[in-house]
């Protein structure tokens, strides 16, 4: 008996993806993305009609696996639920294939002809308002479903989680819905182990022709525990109202997935909304080909997993795809519901059984209550995808038709993933009449494009006038922190535009020079736009605060009045590394670039050309930092027009200027220590006119090739100037001059004007015309070539009277005042022996000369009114550190330097400042440092470098370790040399020690004696010690800590002897007083030792070796010594052999022993070569070093033995080196040599003491200290040890 139930009615909440169809149909096309942002995504975040918590799966995707997607309503309650359970026969054959429809479904699915649509369709038995549940959860094998086309409902739920489902094979399947007044949603669920799609699948299609009844909505859920795949020819089509839920470990769809298919012919204007939910896919989701739109404005949504890959994405010209990535941490599951699969509670079910068909019919309980639920209001904002969310699209393509629409069409791709990557396939925009636009936006993350941008499948493809093609990319729309990166060169044809909004935009290259009339709109970039190469021609560029590595302005076609226009305020942080204006042919084929406004533009290199213009008059300040020159100086036809407001020529920048430059400066001009090269054309130079003020800033830097101050203005080919004519170089309302080296500047300052005039130089080829410095006959020839005096060139000996003099060409006069800078050329004068205009050059007295050049200097002592500021007559060669002190008027400091730092300090300063840099750098350093500080720093540096070169320093760690071991070995020899006893034999002594003790029963008395009685005979010993040591020498200190271990024994045969061996490890560190030299070393020491007895005579022999690996660094804090900072490493090694003889004087039954001794020893010390890791010119280098030492020693030792095992000793002695030889290679810094000679033969005094106590049977504690003092160098060394010994 079936119990009927009244259907309850639930209105759809306004946040559903399916309901979005009705909403968006009334919204202009351009607002689709905004709708997803303001409605859909807030709904996903905020939860939906069921009242779920924010961020839960059920709240976000209740149309997903919980089957409530459509309109976010609860599933429609069926009138009847049919159940089919697969029998046990389906559980037995895992390799068998079944037809799912024929085997299980057909008994509860009816079919018939749809006259309205002229097609056959299928439905659940009894009508589309019923449900079929198929329980085959234990079934195995493969089940094919092929040809189930136009399944119109109701719900179908197939649970086959251990089997494989093949959809398609010989025919496809289509799942759709039955449109009635209740707007039912068809839900089809397949839960399998694997699902493969082998033929087409349609979701929510219209039956047959589609002319009849409409479809409502359909949800197809495919869930597979292992994987979901589709073949290359298997197309999945989603029509309006379709939802596809995919849940698996991985999804790979090789066939085309088509979202937004037309439901019937002519449905171009009908809205289409479809959804794919992959949020339950644990791994990657791979769409080989995804198509959105079928000549309609389809809107599609993908609820994505962390990683989504799309091979080719085809968007119709007005379609939109929204890919929503999960938030950080993923979606949270909603608590499990207590409702059953049919949507009713498990109690009060009425079930009728049909045993023959293995089918149950379950009727819902009586329930006449009607429930009205109002639409859910969701108020929340969008969310960002998690930091690992990625959407990868290899190729993005749009499709278009020839439809003309005002404003064109816009296709869109929107996501919130952390990273949206478009691969090497790039982007293609299909353009037609009225224009097309593609919008790619990432609301909260970054966009990366690795491939080219194409129009109509052509790189550099163009659009027709009035039908512009527009690319729009927006990164971080909501976060304002996204980065858009384009890793391929972008080439845009005519009327093709590019718009990018982001926090930062990075471009490899942009070429709009293929015809022009493009717009590059980067006004939405809030931080920086970085472009490696920008090629323009008639391009509108809207950008602020940019870095352009190279800007090339082309002159393509007739472009009068059409220039590249930077149409926005460029800000204060814009920079172009290189500007190149290409050459035009004539005025109508010209080009140019202009700027709307801006605070500052920095250009490193600027190359201008004829018929190409640069108009920066609306930029407040432009600075040229390296080069300002014509790109065609050898072919200067045509004209350029270069226009600036305020222009600065930066330090060391060079400007080439001629009448072809056509330079206009309407504001101020600052030459900040740059050089202006004036080119003589037709006997004239072009005047540089400055609209307001000019400032000529110069310094005292020296041209090392000539000895002159570096010129601020050069006139090349000055011999061609028209004679008897004033040639005005620069005019301004007011001109000021400044010497940055001395910190002086001013207007109408005669001294500064005279200094400036000596930095105005005239050249004939490379030879200076206005002044000649003659040091030899070659200088005479050069002077003759400069002034056109052939006699001086051919017969230089006739002009030897000029040698040692500076001669001034009085045929040239210079003017530098507050309004103009000019030269007047009368023609060259001729030097004569007594003609004057010369200044004697004094004899150089410096022995350590580096060059014969001379340097100009302010107020030189030889200067007179005829030649002010002309040539410096220094007492030292130019290029020496002394000459720099002279130029700074600090000659007296030279003596101070030698007095307090010596020749070595002077040579080090020469190396650091001049040999590794130049005189200008040296001048800067000494100007910033007092003489006292210079000598202090040099002394600290030479001390540190002497340590670096010293072999004693390199051996310090090994010697401290060896000293520690010498103390330990002496203690071991003292211990094993015991002759003191209580005059009873060993056996009796051991029995006496057990007196009064009781033991458990043992096998024999011998066992008692062995286990519990102490042993007094000299045993075999294993010993280990912790060691530490330190060395103090001239304000530096070294420390060591480590461990030593060994084994020894007393041999009592034909010969009484002690033999032993040891090994030790110690880590040593070193730092000098200034903490500028720091070292750390791992050291190892190993060897053998012995003592032979002949009555009271003792003969000692010892051999050992040591190896240390050192890592050192120089760390100077002062700017003066900063180039010395570097690190290096090397190996140190040593080998030692010792022999000594001593005689024992015994007292108190051998309890007290006094032993004098003498000995000799040999040491071989060495270190490997090294080179520091520095890349500077003062990289430290040192060759290998090796020394052989011979010494003798005399010692006295007192030993006191007490008890049966303990002792104490004192040892003192003197060691004298009597010979040494070897090599100590020189350490070097560039030209500076550090030859640290070894100290003279040394005398050492040594004292040590130690002893041992018994802690337990056969376990002993020993302690010792040693002190060694070098009586020559006053260096001190200290070491101690604490150790244990075990005898057996």
Swiss-Prot record:
PROSITE patterns assigned: AUTOTRANSPORTER (PS51208)
A matching Pfam family: VacA
Keyword Signal attached: yes
InterPro entries to which the protein is assigned, alphabetical: Autotransporte_beta, Autotransporte_beta_dom_sf, OM_autotransptr_brl_dom, Vacuolating_cytotoxin
Region of interest called Disordered, as start-end residue ranges on this chain: 326-377
Superkingdom field: Bacteria
Keyword field: Cell outer membrane, Membrane, Periplasm, Secreted, Signal, Toxin, Transmembrane, Transmembrane beta strand, Virulence
Biased composition regions of type Polar residues, renumbered to the chain: 352-376
GO molecular function terms noted in the UniProt entry: toxin activity
Disulfide pattern: none
Protein name: Vacuolating cytotoxin autotransporter
Organism: Helicobacter pylori (strain J99 / ATCC 700824) (Campylobacter pylori J99)
Gene name as annotated: vacA
């Amino acid at each position: 008996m079936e119990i009927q139930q009244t259907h309850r009615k639930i209105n759809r909440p306004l946040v559903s993806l399916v309901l979005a169809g009705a909403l968006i149909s009334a919204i202009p096309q351009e607002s689709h993305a905004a709708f997803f942002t303001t409605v859909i995504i807030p709904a996903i975040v905020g939860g939906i009609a069921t009242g779920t918590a924010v961020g839960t799966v059920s709240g976000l995707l209740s149309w997903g696996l919980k089957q409530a997607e459509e309109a976010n309503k609860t599933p429609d309650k069926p009138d009847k639920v049919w159940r089919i359970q697969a029998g046990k026969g389906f559980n037995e054959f895992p390799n068998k294939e079944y037809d799912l429809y024929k085997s299980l479904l057909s008994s509860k699915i009816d079919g018939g002809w749809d006259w309205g649509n002229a097609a056959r369709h299928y439905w659940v038995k009894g009508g589309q308002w019923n449900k079929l549940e198929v329980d085959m959860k234990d079934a195995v094998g493969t089940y094919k479903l092929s040809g189930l086309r136009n399944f119109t409902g109701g719900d179908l739920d197939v649970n086959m989680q251990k089997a494989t489902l093949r959809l398609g094979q010989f025919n496809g399947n289509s799942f759709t819905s039955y449109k009635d007044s209740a707007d039912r949603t068809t839900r089809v669920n397949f839960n399998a182990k694997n699902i493969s799609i082998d033929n087409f699948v349609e979701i929510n299609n219209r039956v047959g022709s589609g002319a009849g009844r409409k479809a409502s909505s359909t949800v197809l859920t495919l869930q597979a525990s292992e994987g979901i795949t589709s073949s290359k020819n298997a197309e999945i089509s989603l029509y309006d109202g379709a939802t596809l839920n995919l849940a698996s470990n991985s999804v790979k769809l090789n066939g085309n997935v088509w979202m937004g298919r037309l439901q019937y012919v002519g449905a171009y204007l009908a809205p289409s909304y479809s959804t794919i939910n992959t949020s339950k896919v644990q791994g990657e989701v791979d769409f080989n080909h995804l198509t959105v739109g079928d000549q309609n404005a389809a809107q599609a949504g993908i609820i994505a997993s962390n990683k989504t890959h799309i091979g080719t994405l085809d968007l119709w010209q007005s379609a939109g795809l929204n890919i929503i990535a999960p938030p950080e941490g993923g979606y949270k599951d909603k608590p499990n519901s207590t409702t059953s699969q049919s949507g009713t509670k498990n109690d009060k079910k009425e079930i009728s059984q049909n045993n023959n068909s293995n089918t149950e019919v379950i009727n819902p309980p009586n329930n006449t209550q009607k429930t009205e639920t109002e639409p859910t209001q969701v108020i929340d904002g969008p969310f960002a995808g998690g930091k690992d969310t990625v959407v990868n699209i290899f190729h993005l393509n749009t499709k278009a038709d020839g439809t003309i629409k005002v404003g064109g069409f816009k296709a869109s791709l929107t996501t919130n993933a952390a990273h949206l990557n478009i691969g090497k396939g790039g982007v293609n925009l299909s353009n037609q009449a009225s224009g097309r636009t593609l919008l790619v936006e990432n609301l909260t993350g970054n966009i990366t494009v690795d491939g080219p941008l194409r129009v109509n499948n052509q790189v550099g493809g163009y659009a027709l006038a009035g039908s512009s093609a527009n690319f729009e990319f927006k990164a971080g729309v909501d976060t304002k922190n996204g980065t858009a990166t384009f890793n391929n060169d972008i080439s845009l044809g005519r009327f093709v535009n590019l718009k990018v909004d982001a926090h930062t935009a990075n471009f490899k290259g942009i070429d709009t020079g293929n015809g022009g009339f493009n717009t590059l709109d980067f006004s939405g970039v809030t931080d920086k736009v970085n472009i490696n190469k920008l090629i323009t021609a008639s391009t509108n560029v809207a950008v602020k605060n940019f870095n352009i590595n190279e800007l090339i302005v082309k002159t393509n076609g007739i472009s009068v009045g059409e220039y590249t226009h930077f149409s926005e305020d460029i800000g204060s942080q814009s920079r172009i590394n290189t500007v190149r204006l290409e050459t035009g042919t004539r005025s109508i084929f010209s080009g140019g670039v202009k700027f709307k406004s801006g605070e500052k533009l920095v250009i490193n290199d600027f190359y201008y050309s004829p018929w190409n213009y640069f108009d920066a008059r609306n930029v407040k300040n432009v600075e040229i930092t390296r080069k300002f020159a014509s790109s065609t100086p050898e072919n200067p036809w045509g004209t350029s027009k270069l226009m600036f407001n305020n222009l600065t020529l930066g330090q060391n920048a060079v400007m080439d200027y001629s009448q072809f430059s056509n330079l206009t400066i309407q504001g101020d001009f600052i030459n900040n220590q740059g050089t202006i090269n004036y080119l003589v054309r037709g006997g004239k130079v072009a005047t540089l006119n400055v609209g307001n003020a000019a400032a000529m800033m110069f310094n005292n830097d020296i041209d090392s090739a000539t000895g002159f101050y570096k010129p601020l203005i050069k006139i090349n080919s000055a011999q061609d100037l028209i004679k008897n004519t004033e040639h005005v170089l620069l005019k301004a309302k007011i001109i000021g001059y400044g010497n940055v080296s001395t910190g002086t500047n001013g207007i109408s300052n005669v001294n500064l004007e005279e200094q400036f005039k000596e930095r105005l130089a005239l050249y004939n080829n490379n030879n200076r015309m206005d002044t000649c410095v003659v040091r030899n006959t070659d200088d005479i020839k050069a002077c003759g070539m400069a002034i056109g005096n052939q006699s001086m060139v051919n017969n230089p000996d006739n002009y030897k009277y000029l040698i040692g003099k500076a001669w001034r060409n009085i045929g040239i006069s210079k003017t530098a005042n507050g309004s103009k800078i000019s030269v007047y050329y009368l023609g060259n004068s001729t030097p004569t022996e007594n003609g004057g205009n010369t200044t004697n050059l004094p004899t150089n007295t410096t022995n350590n000369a580096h060059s014969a050049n001379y340097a100009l200097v302010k107020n030189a002592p030889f200067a007179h009114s005829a030649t002010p500021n002309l040539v410096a007559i220094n007492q030292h060669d130019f290029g020496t550190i002394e000459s720099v002190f002279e130029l700074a008027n600090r000659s007296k400091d030279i003596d101070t330097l030698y007095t307090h730092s010596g020749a070595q300090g002077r040579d080090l300063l020469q190396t650091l400042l001049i040999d590794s840099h130049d005189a200008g750098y040296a001048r800067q350093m000494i100007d910033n440092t007092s003489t006292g500080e210079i000598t202090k720093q040099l002394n600290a540096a030479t001390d540190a470098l002497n340590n670096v070169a010293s072999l004693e320093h390199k051996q310090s760690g090994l010697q401290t370790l060896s000293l520690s071991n010498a103390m330990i070995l002496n203690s071991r020899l003292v211990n094993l040399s015991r002759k003191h006893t209580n005059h009873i034999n060993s056996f009796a002594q051991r029995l006496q020690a057990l007196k009064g003790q009781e033991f458990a029963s043992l096998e024999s008395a011998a066992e008692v004696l062995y286990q519990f009685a102490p042993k007094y005979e000299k045993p075999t010993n294993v010993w280990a010690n912790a060691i530490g040591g330190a060395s103090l020498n001239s304000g530096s200190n070294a420390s060591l800590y480590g461990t030593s271990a060994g084994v020894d024994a007393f041999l009592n045969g034909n010969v009484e002897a002690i033999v032993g061996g040891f090994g030790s490890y110690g880590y040593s560190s070193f730092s000098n007083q200034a903490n500028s030299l720091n070292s750390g070393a791992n050291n190892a020491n190993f060897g053998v030792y012995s003592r032979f007895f002949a009555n009271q005579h003792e003969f000692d022999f010892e051999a050992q070796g040591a190896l240390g690996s050192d890592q050192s660094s120089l760390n100077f804090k002062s700017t003066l010594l900063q180039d010395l900072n570097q690190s290096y490493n090397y190996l140190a090694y040593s080998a030692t052999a010792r022999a000594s003889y001593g005689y024992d004087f015994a007292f108190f039954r051998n309890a007290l022993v006094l032993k004098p001794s003498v000995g000799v020893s040999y040491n071989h010390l060495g270190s490997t070569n090294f080179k520091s890791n520095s890349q500077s010119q003062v990289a430290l280098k040192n060759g290998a070093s090796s020394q052989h030492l011979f010494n003798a020693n005399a010692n006295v030792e007192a030993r006191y033995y007490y008890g049966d095992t303990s002792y104490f000793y004192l040892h003192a002695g003197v060691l004298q080196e009597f010979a040494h030889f070897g090599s100590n290679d020189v350490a070097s810094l560039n030209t500076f040599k550090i030859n640290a000679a070894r100290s003279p033969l040394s005398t050492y005094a040594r004292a040590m003491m130690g002893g041992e106590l018994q802690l337990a049977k056969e376990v002993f504690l020993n302690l010792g200290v040693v002190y060694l003092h070098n009586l020559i160098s006053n260096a001190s060394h200290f070491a101690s040890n604490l150790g244990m010994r075990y005898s057996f």
